[in-house]
Amino acid sequence: MKHFFKRLFLIFICLAVLVAGVGMYIGNMAYEEFYDAPWDQILGIENHSRDVSTIRQWERERDWEPVRVNAPDGKILRGTYIENRRDSHKTVILIHGLYQNRTMCLPYMDEYRRLGYNILLIDLRGHGESEGDHTEWGISEVDDLLMWCQWLQNRDPQMTIGLHGISLGASMALLYAGSEYGQDLSFVVADSAYGNIISLGREKLWQAVGDKRAIWGYNLLDPFFQAAMFYHTHKMVSSLEPAQAVKRMKVPVLFLHGSEDELVPVKTARSLYDNCTSPKKEIHIFEGSPHAVGIETNQSEYMRVLSQFLEEDADSV
C-alpha cells in the first residue's frame, strides 16, 4: 500500500509538471498572439496609424516644431510642439487612440490654446512616425510618457503638465497618472478609456463566438498568459489596467464617455470614476455619442465641459 501511494504521488507530480509545461507553452503562444493580433479587425477599428500627411502639412504651413525623444529601449518617438502665443508655463500632452496618430488630436487643440496652454502632440510607439511595430498596452508607454514629460521640463523647468488622452491614449494617461511618475501632473482628461484590456478582449470574444466554451478556455489560459507576460516583461497584467491605476491617483481627473459606446461600454467610465481615489474627479457622459467621438457629436458641450474643468482646476491651484 505504501508503494502504491508513492507511485500515485509520483504520477501526480509528473502530470502536474506536464500540465504546467503545456500550459506555459500555450500561455507563451497566447502572449505572442496578444501582441501580434490584428486588433483593428478584432475591435473593428480603421487603421490610420501611419498616415501623417496632414500633420506634416500643418507643421509646414503653421511653422510648428517637429520634436523627438528617445525611449528607454532606444526607440525614437516623434511629436509636434506648438507654443502658445502667450508666455505660458503650462502644457497639455494630447494622446491619440489605437491605430491613429497625433493628427487625431488636432480638433482638441483650440480650447487649450484659448486657455493659454502650449500643446505637445505625440505619436505613441508603433503609431505615426514613432518607431515600433505595435502598441504595448502600457508595458513601455508609461516610460515613454516620462521621456516626454522630462523633455518638456528640460525645456522649461517651470512647466506644469496635463494629459488629455482619447481611447487608448486615455488609458495610457491613466496608467501614467497612477504611476510613481504621474503624481506631479496638473490634471488628466480621460476620454473613452478602457479599464482592463483582457476583460475587453474576453467580451469581444464572447460577442464574436457566442460560445461559453471559448470563455472557459480563455479563463483557463489566463494564469499561464499572465505567467508568460511576467517572464517576458517582469510586469503583472494588473500593472496594465487603468482600473487599478485609478486607485492610486491623486491628480484632478475628468472622465468623458459616450452613452452609445459599443466598443468600451459606458459602465466602464462609471466604474473608473467610482474607484478613482483622486480628491478632485468629475465624469460627463455625452448622450447618443459612440466611441471616442464626443468632440464631433457634441462639440459645444465637449468644449464647455472641458473648459469648466480646466478653469476650476486652475482656480484651485
Could you tell me what each predicted segment is?
Residues 178-235, 244-245:
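Hydrolase active-site cap/lid region
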Residues 248-250, 255-257, 261:
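Short beta-strand/loop motif that positions the catalytic acidic residue
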Residues 135-156:
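Alpha/beta-hydrolase active-site loop
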Residues 289-299:
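Catalytic histidine-centered segment of alpha/beta-hydrolase-like enzymes
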Residues 98-111:
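The serine-hydrolase catalytic nucleophile loop
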Residues 4, 14-70:
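An N-terminal hydrophobic leader/cap segment in hydrolases
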Residues 260-264, 292-293:
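Acidic catalytic loop of the alpha/beta-hydrolase fold
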Residues 111-131:
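Conserved alpha/beta-hydrolase
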